[in-house]
Regions:
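Solvent-exposed, non-transmembrane regions of integral membrane proteins
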Residues: 1-728
Length: 728
């Protein structure tokens, strides 16, 4: 039996190494992903699975039926994957309007015949109102007398063949992903169903280790110390800009920005954040900053407010600090300093930094030339409403002369009012423009409620002060609690109540941000790095409050985790910009997949902080073995729901992927690292196979080290590796 144990766990360790190395090699050579579907790697999985099943039987795991069912479900899932690898066909089919085909191109370039012909009756793109952002791709199909449609997240199935709308080509034809997997999907889904049922069975079983720990651990009065608040200050500015009243009136206009109609305030806020990293600059609001660049470009071109992160680009521009002015982008003979490096960007030392600097210069250039202010709604010959700027050359030819002059000359008139200081006339001008927008914008305009909600969101969404406060409070509370516990002391009740109040207030504030973001964007806010980190911060507090009775250290941990994740969100890990969702992302399965995994990550973070707390206690008092053992039991208790939720989240993502593009596992780096994380933490369940995990300090060390896989899954993949999940 020892040989079987070493074989199964040894092969799993080898598989983990191959998985991790493969994701890194994909960054260098995209063809490296082929290793995951190669015969030798499939054989490695097969031998591991067979040896693991044999080890389960020899160790009589079947005497603990819930645990046996969990392990058996993974064997069924792997059997389904093997069946798909042996029998399935995947490829691409391109059809033009009115054309039909009875074959498709496989991934390896060969051609596979279908037992029927498929005809594309019509293909159409549905757009978000008033924009050029695609909302859905819809193909109307017919075959064997059967009519149907294929669109994003809506599969057309016929005789075992599944057709997924993946896009369209330059000639207006439709592009489908074709999947023919009549056996593998059924086996795999059966494994998913067995996994879900067995997880529920295990968690409810009275004989499981989880329930044993739940009964054993009882609440003990422990708490935390008080809070440290941070004050923020602002200063007045001498830079030329609109007065606050007129700037707010300008921000109250509608504008086409980010493929949607929103308050111009939103554009101003993100314009300012993009340039300098904050929503305000030198005591001026975002609307005032935008107005300064719009009406006083010469003065503002001298101001060093463009944040340059790259040291290489700073050297190229010849600046000493981190901020550049527009004039720094030009030489003494008026040559654009980035022009030549951009031509040979592959040879530049920091191409990403160069692109970011060029993008910041470009958004200023587009604003000052009037191209980015698309504030004028106009109808074309078909009655379709589009939004245009003063600098656009594609204004509909049907536009009458008076309206054409209004579009082309109104901002010049506004500039004249600004230069002569006629502020009341400027207010009247903005009022008239807004009336024009409401009269001609039609169905493209957001509702008044949504418009006001977005302005409220813009006002409250800067959570940096909150994040700083929570991190300071959480750090002081966390380490104070650890030191008190090591000495056998208790913090005062008022400190605990204060910390609870801070945690609840923070949770309510973040809840307001999330609800506003959800309402304004029209989708669950889990589509990018900013939104998922904000959701993780939101999860941290209720988890801490629920766990506090049995694990008192959870409260300061929750405050600290909430602060750290909020700060990461505010640092702009994904440029927090609301935009219309890509069609493939409009799925409730995706939202459930992200939400479940984020809750799992929050639990794993608590376990890592438990480990850190144990090491702090050990350094302060080597006799604090009882407290360290209790922390270990708390981490063990959290380990079960954390890994179970992570597992469910991974396979929810697999189902979503299969529904969306016909492949429930595509070896994307994010998928691979989520799998690595799940396996790494699953090792910790096997105390019988790894007796050293029973030792408290060894267990805590493993939990701290294992959390690095979570960090790499989120940050490493998002910002260093490539793939469909990369946010950077």
């Amino acid at each position: 039996m020892r040989v079987l144990k070493k074989t199964s766990f040894g092969l799993m360790a080898i598989i983990l190494v191959v998985l991790a190395v493969g994701t890194i090699l994909q960054k260098i050579d995209s063809s490296a992903v082929a290793a995951y579907t190669s015969p030798w790697f499939v054989a490695l999985w097969t031998v591991m699975a067979v040896s693991a099943v044999a080890y389960m039987l020899r160790s009589r795991l079947y005497r603990r039926l819930p645990a046996f069912a969990v392990h058996a479900s993974f064997a069924v899932i792997l059997a389904g994957a093997l069946t798909s690898w042996l029998t399935s066909e995947h490829g691409t089919l391109r059809l033009k309007d009115g054309a039909e085909a009875s074959a498709f191109t496989l991934d390896d370039g060969s051609v596979a015949k279908m037992p029927f012909s498929l005809k594309l009756q019509r293909f159409e793109i549905e757009y978000y109102a008033g924009t050029e952002a695609p909302m859905d791709f819809v193909s109307h199909l017919s075959t064997d007398g059967v009519n149907g449609t294929a669109s994003m997240n809506n599969v057309f199935s016929h005789r075992g063949y599944r057709f997924y709308q993946s896009g369209y080509d330059s000639e207006g034809g439709s592009v489908f992903t074709v999947a023919h997997d009549p056996m593998g999907i059924g086996v795999t889904y059966a494994g998913y169903a067995l996994l879900l049922a067995s997880i529920c069975w295990f968690m409810m079983s009275g004989k499981s280790r989880f329930r044993s720990l739940l009964r054993k651990l009882s609440a003990k009065p422990l708490a935390v110390v008080g809070a440290l608040m941070v004050a923020m200050s602002a200063q007045a500015s001498d830079l030329p800009a609109l007065p606050q009243q007129q700037a707010e009136e300008m921000g109250n206009l509608y504008v086409l920005y980010g493929d949607r109609i929103c308050p111009l305030q939103t554009m101003a806020k993100e314009f300012t954040e993009k340039l300098c990293g904050n929503a305000t600059f030198d005591g001026l609001s975002a609307e005032q900053v935008l107005s300064g660049w719009l009406y006083y470009p010469t003065d503002w071109s001298k101001v060093p407010m463009i944040k340059i992160k790259s040291a290489e680009v700073r050297r190229l521009l010849g600046i000493d600090g981190k901020y550049a002015s527009v004039r720094d982008f030009f030489s003494d003979v008026n040559e654009y300093k980035l022009e030549k490096p951009l031509r040979g960007i592959d040879r530049f030392a920091d191409p990403q930094g160069l692109r970011e600097a060029a993008e910041k210069f470009d958004i200023i250039n587009r604003l000052t030339t009037g191209k980015s202010l698309k504030i004028f709604p106009l109808k074309d010959a078909e009655g379709k409403i589009g939004w245009f700027s003063q600098g656009d050359d594609n204004i509909p030819v049907e536009t009458d002369t008076q309206e054409w002059m209004f579009v082309k000359m109104s901002l010049s008139y506004a500039n004249e009012l600004v230069q002569t200081g006629r502020w009341s006339d400027l207010s009247d001008f903005y009022t008239k423009v807004r009336k024009y927008q409401r009269k001609n914008g039609g169905a493209t305009l957001p509702s008044d409620t949504r418009f006001k909600a977005e302005k409220t969101y813009n006002t409250v969404s800067n959570a940096r002060p909150l994040a700083i406060t929570l991190m300071c409070v959480g750090l002081v509370a966390f380490f104070s609690f650890c030191l008190l516990s090591a000495r056998g002391g208790r913090p005062r009740r008022w400190a605990v109540l204060t910390l609870r109040a801070i945690a609840v207030a923070a949770w309510l504030y973040i809840s307001v941000i999330i609800v506003l973001l959800w309402f304004v964007s029209g989708h669950i806010p889990m589509s990018n790095g900013y939104e998922t980190m904000l959701f993780l911060a939101w999860c941290a507090v209720p988890i801490a409050m629920l766990a506090e009775r049995r694990m008192p250290l959870a409260l300061p941990m929750g405050v600290l985790l909430c602060g750290m994740t909020t700060m990461v969100a505010m640092m702009g890990i994904s440029n927090p910009r609301m935009s219309q969702l890509m069609p493939v992302l409009q799925s409730p399965l995706l939202s459930a997949h992200v939400a479940v995994i984020m809750v799992a990550y929050a639990l794993l973070a608590f376990m890592a902080m438990n480990g850190i707390a144990a090491f702090v206690m050990r350094m302060r008092n080597r006799a604090a073995t009882d407290e360290i053992t209790v922390l270990k039991e708390h981490s063990e208790l959290l380990l079960y729901p954390a890994v179970m939720l992570l597992t469910i989240g991974i396979f929810l993502g697999a189902v979503w992927a299969n529904v969306s593009w016909g492949r429930y596992w595509g070896w994307d780096p994010k998928e691979v690292w989520a799998l690595i994380t799940m396996i790494v933490y699953a090792f910790a369940f096997h105390r019988e196979s790894f007796p050293w995990l029973r030792r408290p300090m060894a267990f805590h060390a493993y939990m701290v080290l294992a959390f690095f896989s979570v960090l790499f899954t989120y940050f490493g993949v998002n910002f260093f590796l490539t793939g469909m999940h990369s946010y950077a």
